[in-house]
A protein has these predicted regions:
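Conserved PLP-enzyme active-site core in the AAT-like
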Residues: 2-5, 43-195
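Conserved N-terminal alpha-helix of the aminotransferase class I/II PLP-enzyme fold
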Residues: 2-48, 52, 70-74
């Protein structure tokens, strides 16, 4: 007789083991200190992160295409930050169908140094333009925002399996979503200390 045959996948021990496995996998893959899997869409996770660290503060958004506009959309609808600075991706030429590139990293760093935003929000991968921010770009942004005590939040919803090492790049918080009604948030030490 198998007594475990009637054990539901929703029993507390089974669900707890699943959540523990997800936590361990995410920590290992992203070199994260802490993780949260929360019910709600990617937009829900974005708003939760914004409310946690950007309420009443100046923020900088790197907008590399249509989907990274979502940060600005959330901010305009909710009034979470006191001020939003936006730096957009740029076309690489003047053709009718140009490629796009992220805003020049040196200009972004100078803007961070001058404006001192409390949080910098950026998309790791922008689906609509095909832009991916390379690790060296992330490192420079993180160093600039950390120099005045700010946080760096990276939207990895479209990153797929392009893992970001939070410790190596200096990213403080990563937001992702499997598009199944859940948001995944990962944090490194600095983000946890500021909650």
């Amino acid at each position: 007789v198998r007594t475990d045959a009637l054990t539901s996948h929703l029993t507390p021990t089974s669900l707890q083991q699943i959540m523990n496995d997800i936590d361990a996998t995410l920590k290992e893959a992203y070199n994260a200190t802490s993780t949260i899997v929360m019910p709600g869409s990617g937009s829900y996770g974005m708003e939760a992160v914004a409310r946690q660290w950007a309420t009443g503060k100046k923020v900088l958004v790197l907008r590399n295409g249509y989907f990274s506009y979502r940060w600005t959309d959330i901010f305009e609808q909710t009034g979470i930050p006191s001020e939003t600075i936006v730096m957009r991706g740029q076309p690489t030429d003047n053709s009718s169908t140009p490629q796009f590139a992220p805003h020049d990293v040196d200009e972004v760093v100078k803007t961070i140094q001058r404006e001192k935003p409390a949080v910098v929000f950026a998309p790791h991968v922008e689906t609509s333009t095909g832009i991916i921010l390379p690790d060296d770009y992330l490192v420079k942004i993180a160093a600039a925002v950390h120099a005045h005590g700010g946080l760096f939040v990276l939207d990895c919803i479209a990153s797929g399996t392009v893992w970001v090492d939070m410790k190596a790049t200096g990213v403080d918080a990563i937001l992702s979503a499997p598009q199944k009604g859940e948001s995944i948030l990962m944090f490194y030490i600095r983000a946890i200390s500021l909650t």
